[in-house]
């Protein structure tokens, strides 16, 4: 009954990764027409719980059926934001969707925290946005940030994990 059989790759000892692929993209199309579509990931993950201590689901920056499935299957969500206007509106939308999934479908997901991406500590605007996030969201904003780095785009372009990027400087 699974939309597609998606096979994880072993990345490091005790770490498997299910990279983005055309099969994964096609899954969303199939999921949209499947009854009980919001619960598909939950069912798959229940079958994997004994194999893994933790399962991390990296979602696209959308609130489509894959993200909804991830929220329904998860205990916690960590929300990345680059701090721009649309990302801030996206945080409002994800709060709304989480509330809706809780009320309508019994989701148990809780927000663990937020972190900034594309962050440049030397740029006043980024520092101001981060301070604004902390004012709005409080202690749930992680100290950890993902800096603005060309290596991130290069790894995505080369379809490889940043950790396995061809350039050693990209792994710093």
Q: What function would you assign to each model-found segment?
A:
Residues 7-8, 30, 34, 87, ...:
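Alpha-helix initiation/capping motif
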Residues 159-161:
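Short glycine/proline- and charge-enriched loop/turn segments
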Residues 163-172:
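Single conserved hydrophobic/aromatic residue that forms the stacking wall/gate
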């Amino acid at each position: 009954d699974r939309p597609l059989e998606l096979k994880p790759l072993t990345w490091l000892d005790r770490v498997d990764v299910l990279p983005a692929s055309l099969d994964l993209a096609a899954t969303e199309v199939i999921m949209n027409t499947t009854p009980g579509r919001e619960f598909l990931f939950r069912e798959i993950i229940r079958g994997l719980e004994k194999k893994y201590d933790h399962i991390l689901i990296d979602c696209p920056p959308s609130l489509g059926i894959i993200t909804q499935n991830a929220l329904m299957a998860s205990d916690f969500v960590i929300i990345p934001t680059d701090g721009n206007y649309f990302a801030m509106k996206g945080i409002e939308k994800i709060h709304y969707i989480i509330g809706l999934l809780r009320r309508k479908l019994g989701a148990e997901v809780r927000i663990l925290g937020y972190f900034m991406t594309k962050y440049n500590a030397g740029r006043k605007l980024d520092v101001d946005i981060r301070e604004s996030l902390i004012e709005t969201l409080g202690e749930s904003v992680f100290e950890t940030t993902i800096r603005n780095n060309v290596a991130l785009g290069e790894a995505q372009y080369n379809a490889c994990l940043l950790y396995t990027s061809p350039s050693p400087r990209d792994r710093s």
